[in-house]
């Protein structure tokens, strides 16, 4: 059957430029073919007769591919599952109607009616009565908020120039909590917190609810600071421990919080102001300058004492360079370290008895003939002995208590 059907179909490769190259090609060929020297005539007359009759089978073939498409589209257009579901639902409804006919008695009807009434009443209680409650609560909250916002909107309690920002609008719960805390407990001012540079940051909000006028508190603070600054200038040299609290720099934010605490405590208990002394920044500068003058060693009567105080600095430099020199020396490390240890012990002894250190500086100048070291301002007088060093470059002076060890000279080490 396939042979006869394929003979009625023209070959596709004839339309191509090379033509059909297959010798045993089953399809119909209207042109002769030459395949590798083999001549093949066109198809026979039997195929032509079949070709005339191609109209009927072609129509049947054109209808054949449409049939499977219709079969595929049928379940989409006619779903059987929905029909079965509808039928089942109808059957269930019929069964319910039949059961209702059997069970409908006056007692059961009353029970169903009572159940429906109970459900309706419960729905009214839980659903229909809640919106009025919500509306009433909403109508009450704005009035309460307006009453609480009135003292804040006046602006008399707000302080200008302060880095603290007071919120103008708060929720009802926060306002009630703050009012309770301000009424039940007094605001606490800790003196130790002021000494450590801190303060109670929540005090300004409590000041507002207590009704304290902060403009008056600021004027009182200015008067207190002026009086206390005059007292501290008079009592600079007094060794009282309370004045030492005012000689320490405090950050500006902590000073603001602490001054607010002081103003609050001054309103409550004026006697407590004797413990804390607020000081402005210019007074801190004077205290800092006085401390610097005290630390500088400029008031010594003798220049020898000044040299004795600053003498350990060149000694540390010379010992550092000497240790580096001894590390680089070969085959003589142990002897050099032992010699340096004995020498440092001998040189530290006269430094306690004699503050001028005349021989001490000479010993260092002889021991280190390096010209690249920059001399300090305290040892410049003893370090300018260049002529004496040129005469005896390797001479060394030893004290009485110092031991003299023979120095081995190896590989050009001095």
From Swiss-Prot:
InterPro entries: DUF5571, Znf-CCCH_3
Start-end of Polar residues biased regions: 350-359
GO annotation terms (biological process): poly(A)+ mRNA export from nucleus
Disordered as annotated region, ranges: 136-168, 297-333, 346-414
Ranges of compositional bias, category Basic and acidic residues: 399-414
Superkingdom in the source lineage: Eukaryota
PANTHER family: RIKEN CDNA 1700017N19 GENE, ZN-FINGER, C-X8-C-X5-C-X3-H TYPE-CONTAINING
Name under which the protein is recorded: Uncharacterized protein C12orf50
UniProt source species: Homo sapiens
Lineage: Eukaryota, Metazoa, Chordata, Craniata, Vertebrata
Gene: C12orf50
């Amino acid at each position: 059957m396939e042979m006869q059907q394929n003979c009625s179909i023209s070959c596709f490769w004839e339309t191509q430029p090379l033509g059909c190259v297959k010798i045993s090609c089953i399809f119909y060929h209207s042109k002769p073919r030459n395949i590798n020297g083999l001549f093949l005539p066109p198809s026979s007359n039997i195929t032509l007769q079949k070709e005339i009759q191609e109209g009927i089978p072609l129509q049947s073939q054109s209808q054949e591919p449409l049939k499977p498409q219709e079969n595929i589209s049928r379940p989409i257009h006619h779903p059987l599952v929905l029909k079965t579901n509808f039928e089942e639902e109808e059957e269930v409804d019929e069964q319910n109607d039949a059961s209702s006919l059997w069970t409908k008695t006056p007692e059961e009807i009353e029970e169903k009616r009572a159940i429906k009434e109970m459900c309706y009443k419960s729905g009214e209680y839980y659903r229909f009565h809640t919106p009025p409650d919500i509306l009433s609560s909403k109508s009450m909250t704005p009035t309460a908020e307006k009453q609480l916002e009135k003292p804040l909107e006046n602006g008399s309690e707000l302080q200008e120039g302060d880095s603290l920002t007071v919120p103008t609008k708060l929720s009802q719960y926060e306002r009630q909590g703050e009012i309770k805390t301000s009424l039940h407990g007094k605001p606490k001012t800790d003196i130790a917190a002021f000494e450590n540079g801190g303060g109670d940051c929540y005090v300004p909000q409590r000041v507002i609810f207590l009704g304290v006028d902060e403009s008056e508190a600021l004027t009182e603070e200015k008067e207190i600071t002026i009086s206390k600054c005059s007292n501290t200038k008079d009592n600079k040299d007094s060794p009282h421990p309370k004045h030492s609290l005012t000689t320490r720099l405090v950050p500006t934010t902590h000073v603001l919080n602490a001054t607010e605490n002081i103003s609050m405590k001054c309103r409550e208990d004026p006697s407590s102001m004797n413990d804390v002394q607020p000081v402005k920044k210019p007074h801190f500068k004077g205290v800092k300058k006085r401390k610097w003058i005290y630390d500088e060693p400029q008031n010594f009567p003798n220049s020898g004492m000044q040299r004795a105080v600053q003498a350990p600095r060149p000694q540390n430099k010379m010992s550092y360079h000497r240790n580096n020199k001894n590390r680089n020396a070969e085959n003589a490390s142990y002897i050099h370290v032992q010699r340096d240890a004995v020498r440092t012990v001998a040189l530290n002894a006269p430094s306690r008895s004699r503050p001028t250190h005349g021989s001490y500086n000479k010993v260092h100048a002889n021991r280190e003939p390096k010209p690249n070291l920059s001399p300090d301002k305290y040892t410049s007088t003893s370090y300018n002995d260049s002529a004496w060093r040129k005469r005896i470059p390797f001479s060394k002076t030893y004290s009485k208590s110092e031991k003299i060890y023979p120095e081995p000279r190896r590989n050009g080490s001095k």
